Amino acid sequence: MSNENESNNLSLSDDLNAVESTGSSKDSDVIIESAASDDSSTSEANYVPEQDNLEKMILSTGIRVGTPVKTKYMVPFIIRANPEGLYILDISKTLSRIDIAAKFISRADISKVAVTSAREYGKTPVEKFCDLTHAKYILGRFMPGTFTNPALPKYMEPQIVIVTDPQADQQAVLEATRAGVPVIAICNSDNVTSKVDLVIPANNRGRKALATVYWLLAREVLKKQGVIKTDSEMKIPIEDFETKLVEEFS
């Protein structure tokens, strides 16, 4: 049974149930070694030689490295703890959830998809994702009432809300829930996901990890929108999604 909010959109529920019943996303084009395997090996069943460098680079970003704390909500997405005591997230579930999210986003009016990040390291990834897909970004402090108070100048009625961290972006999550809008969230091992409709398990604190999640999500959305047809047509490197350290202090 999923930990996600059961009041989510029917089509999102169907996509999620289809993946969880099979254990993987049938249409996912992202091939990465199983998180349960050793880092130096790849799954023989899914191994694609030309993707080897990309796979290693993605894993090197720390995308699956969680925190020393786990919540009951995130237990299904954790495979083990490493020697440093950090919980390791299941990369196969990360990728399948990115695929589900991309399918759902591609069926929406992209101009009504709101993406938020209160976290500094999430700002550039979110902005780049929105530039490519034409979703709307909300960076920094989320103004209370943005989704619930029509009198506000920046009021909007999103069809989908994507948050970088359900804790840091809790006001956006709360208002989306009140408005009956599905919430997609990047969730670390210590997050509470009771108000999240679709969890994307991943490191949501790391600069490179967040860039990687949003790059993968952007690529899959563009493919499902028909903007690009293959992975190789995604010419923008992951590095372009990273928040540069100089930006933080400028």
Please state what every model-predicted region is.
Residues M1-E50, S232-S250:
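Intrinsically disordered, compositionally biased charged tails
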Residues V48-E84, A118-E127:
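Short, compositionally biased "basic patch" segments
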Residues R64-G66, I88-S92, F104-R107:
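Electropositive, gly/pro-rich neighborhoods at or near active sites that engage anionic ligands
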Residues I78-I98, T133:
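Glycine-rich phosphate-binding "P-loop"
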Residues I98-S111:
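Glycine-rich phosphate/diphosphate-binding loops that line cofactor/substrate pockets in enzymes
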Residues V115-S117, I186:
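P-loop/Walker A NTP-binding module and the surrounding RecA-like catalytic core of P-loop NTPases
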Residues G122, E127-L210, L217-R219, Q225:
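Long, charge-patterned amphipathic alpha-helical coiled-coil/hairpin "stalk" segments used as oligomerization
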Residues A211-P237, F241-K244:
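A charged, well-structured terminal subsegment
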